[in-house]
């Protein structure tokens, strides 16, 4: 397995593979890898000749372009991540620093703007977040030129934004969304889970419980009670609700449903537990 720290090292490794018409799967990550990332790599390994994984904590998608505690405290464990990726059969790891990605200033002159799609839900709480995501992903697509790229369904809005990026900018690749991986207690796997204390993790379990209840209601034809779900999260000790919304599964446009659900939908949510912000979602299928 090659670990490329520069764009030149990456391109030197990939150019012969493109010449040989080997299929390439890209798994973009910010490191602090877990079983959810491993599932992305496994899917990429299954569908491609070559798997490339990027590890880059992207300051552009954090508050104040990374000048914040969330960016500074984001888990970084490159050696452990590289060992995991080698065990999972990854061929190339691209692990640049900020200057390598964005030049001496650490900021690009040109950005991808995601507009209204990137300004609601997660984007309302994290202004500019999806512009930063789309910008770095566009750069990775240009550098790697993958046939397929793999993202976790846990970040449902990110998946929708990236699909739109590919469509609007005519990137010649497929986007694969891989189902959420959950721990035995139901919590969605996330790099941020490392920062939860035992008490915080116990408090956070209210989120999957609320989502599973909504899933059951949809599947059995019961009326959805979105406001009741919000109330449960607001009342939970140690938890602060950011948002919980019912949206169209494809467009993420808000949905208003009275009575039983009559179309596929998604519930997306974010909460704060201690100093950690967690996101989750669940697909709802009507009876």
UniProtKB/Swiss-Prot annotation:
The active site is at residue 37. Beta-alanine binds at residue 61. (R)-pantoate binds at residues 61, 158. Pfam families: Pantoate_ligase. It catalyses: (R)-pantoate + beta-alanine + ATP = (R)-pantothenate + AMP + diphosphate + H(+). Keywords: ATP-binding, Cytoplasm, Ligase, Nucleotide-binding, Pantothenate biosynthesis. GO terms for cellular component: cytosol. It comes from the Bacteria. Its main location: cytoplasm. ATP binds at residues 30-37, 152-155, 181, 189-192. It is found in: Cytoplasm. It is an enzyme of class 6 (ligase). Signal peptide: none annotated. One of its GO terms (biological process) is pantothenate biosynthetic process. InterPro entries: Pantoate_ligase (IPR003721), Pantoate_ligase_C (IPR042176), Rossmann-like_a/b/a_fold (IPR014729). One of its GO terms (molecular function) is pantoate-beta-alanine ligase activity. Pathway: Cofactor biosynthesis; (R)-pantothenate biosynthesis; (R)-pantothenate from (R)-pantoate and beta-alanine: step 1/1. Its EC number is 6.3.2.1. The reaction proceeds by a bi uni uni bi ping pong mechanism. Homodimer. Catalyzes the condensation of pantoate with beta-alanine in an ATP-dependent reaction via a pantoyl-adenylate intermediate. Belongs to the pantothenate synthetase family. This is Pantothenate synthetase. It comes from Corynebacterium efficiens (strain DSM 44549 / YS-314 / AJ 12310 / JCM 11189 / NBRC 100395).
